Design a protein with these regions (language model features):
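Short interface patches used for recognition in eukaryotic signaling and trafficking proteins
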Residues: 6-11, 54, 74-75, 95-99
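Winged-helix-like regulatory helical subdomains adjacent to P-loop NTPase cores
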Residues: 41-88, 92
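Terminal-proximal interaction/regulatory segments of ATP-powered molecular machines
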Residues: 80-176
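Conserved phosphate/pyrophosphate-binding and hydrolysis machinery centered on Walker-type P-loop NTPases
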Residues: 10-17, 38, 60-67, 83-86, ...
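Conserved AAA+ ATPase small/helical "lid" subdomain
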Residues: 1-52
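Amphipathic alpha-helical transducer elements in NTP-driven molecular machines
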Residues: 3-4, 17, 21-24, 41, ...
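Active-site catalytic microenvironments for nucleophilic, acid-base chemistry
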Residues: 26, 30, 76-77, 92, ...
Length: 176
């Protein structure tokens, strides 16, 4: 059942046989690491997860500084347990920019960067409709949060905030 599972995973996204072969290759490597000769379904599932994590890590490494700062703000707002709307995330972003001594972009531009991160599969966000009160975008999750955070904090431009606790970047608002 291993090869059909690899084929199914490969077909899920784009129907690409190369993806299936890549999953099978990584599953084989994982099998070797556990000193076995038989690739099992769990190896295939772990391989798929590893490939996804590696893809996200590569994307995060190549992001420009402003996008990395927006991603870090997304991680911090989710970690805080506060309402993870774009407007709340923007407040965290502004504090991060001040700590990093980088220019603060407009909320509209930060929303655009958030949409780009969503399209790249680095974050997951949804649009919430609130009737006559309009709509707002909410950040639901960050793919490979711990790996992404580790990569972000290794970036030399993010060094000034490495030792600062997350709580320092979460504003104290009345509505929070």
């Amino acid at each position: 059942m291993v090869i059909p599972l690899c084929a199914a995973y490969g077909a899920q996204e784009h129907g690409d046989a190369r993806k299936a072969i890549d999953i099978l290759r990584v599953a084989g490597e994982l099998t070797e690491m556990r000193k076995s000769y038989i690739v099992e379904e769990t190896d295939v599932k772990n391989a798929k997860e590893k490939i996804e994590i590696d893809r996200v890590i590569e994307v995060v490494k190549t992001l420009p500084t402003q996008s990395k700062t927006v991603l870090l703000a997304c991680i911090y707002i989710l970690a805080s347990g506060k309402d993870s709307t774009i407007s709340n995330m923007y407040q965290v972003y502004r504090l991060l920019c001040a700590a990093l001594s980088i220019d603060i972009l407009t909320q509209r531009r930060v929303t655009d960067l958030t949409n780009e991160l969503d399209q790249l599969g680095v974050i997951n966000s949804t649009l919430q409709y609130k009737g006559r009160y309009g709509r707002s975008k909410k950040i639901m999750s960050v793919s490979s949060k711990s790996s992404s955070l580790e990569i972000l904090l290794k970036d030399f431009r993010m060094q000034p905030i490495e030792k600062i606790p997350i709580e320092a970047f979460i504003p104290k608002f009345k509505n929070w």
